[in-house]
C-alpha cells in the first residue's frame, strides 16, 4: 500500500512539473531563417508561429515562388529548433524517472 501511495505522490509531482514545463515552452522562442537571413520565422517551442520577417528586396511579383520556398524553409528551420528546445525540456523533466525508451518523453 505504501508503494501505491508513493507512486500516486510521484505521479502528482510529475503532473505539476509537466504543467510548469508547458508554461516554460510558451516562453521559449526560436528563430528559423533561410536565404541567408532574408526570411526569418519566430516560433515558440510549442510550435506557435509568432512572426515572419521578409526582407523588402524579396518582395517582387516575378520572384513569388522563390519567396514562397524561402518561407517554407524558414518555417521548417524554426520548427526543428522548437522541437529541439521541447526535447531538451522533456529530457530535463523525465531524465530521473527511469522511463523506458519509446514513450515519447525523451
From Swiss-Prot:
Q: Which domain of life is it from?
A: Bacteria
**Where in the cell is the protein located?**
Cytoplasm, Nucleoid
What would you give as a GO molecular function for this chain, any one? DNA binding
User: Which Gene3D superfamilies does the entry link to?
Assistant: Nucleoid-associated protein YbaB-like domain
- List UniProt keywords, sorted A-Z: Cytoplasm, DNA-binding
Keyword Transcription (UniProt)? no
**Record InterPro entries:** YbaB-like_sf (IPR036894), YbaB/EbfC (IPR004401)
- Where is it predominantly found? cytoplasm
Q: What Pfam families does the annotation carry?
A: YbaB_DNA_bd (PF02575)
SUPFAM superfamilies with a match to the protein in the record: YbaB-like
GO terms for cellular component: bacterial nucleoid; cytosol
What this chain does, per the entry, is described as: Binds to DNA and alters its conformation. May be involved in regulation of gene expression, nucleoid organization and DNA protection.
Q: Tell me how this protein assembles.
A: Homodimer.
Q: Which family does it belong to?
A: Belongs to the YbaB/EbfC family.
Name used for this protein in its record: Nucleoid-associated protein Nwi_0368
Source organism per UniProt: Nitrobacter winogradskyi (strain ATCC 25391 / DSM 10237 / CIP 104748 / NCIMB 11846 / Nb-255)
Organismal lineage: Bacteria, Pseudomonadati, Pseudomonadota, Alphaproteobacteria, Hyphomicrobiales
Amino acid at each position: 500500500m505504501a508503494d501505491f501511495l508513493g507512486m500516486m505522490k510521484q505521479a502528482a509531482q510529475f503532473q505539476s512539473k509537466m504543467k510548469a514545463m508547458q508554461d516554460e515552452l510558451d516562453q521559449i522562442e526560436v528563430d528559423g531563417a533561410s536565404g541567408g537571413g532574408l526570411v526569418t520565422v519566430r516560433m515558440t517551442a510549442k510550435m506557435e508561429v509568432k512572426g515572419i520577417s521578409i526582407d523588402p528586396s524579396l518582395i517582387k511579383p516575378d520572384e513569388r515562388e522563390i519567396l514562397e520556398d524561402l518561407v517554407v524553409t524558414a518555417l521548417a528551420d524554426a520548427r526543428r529548433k522548437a522541437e529541439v528546445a521541447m526535447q531538451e525540456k522533456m529530457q530535463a523533466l523525465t531524465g530521473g524517472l527511469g522511463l523506458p525508451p519509446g514513450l515519447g518523453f525523451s
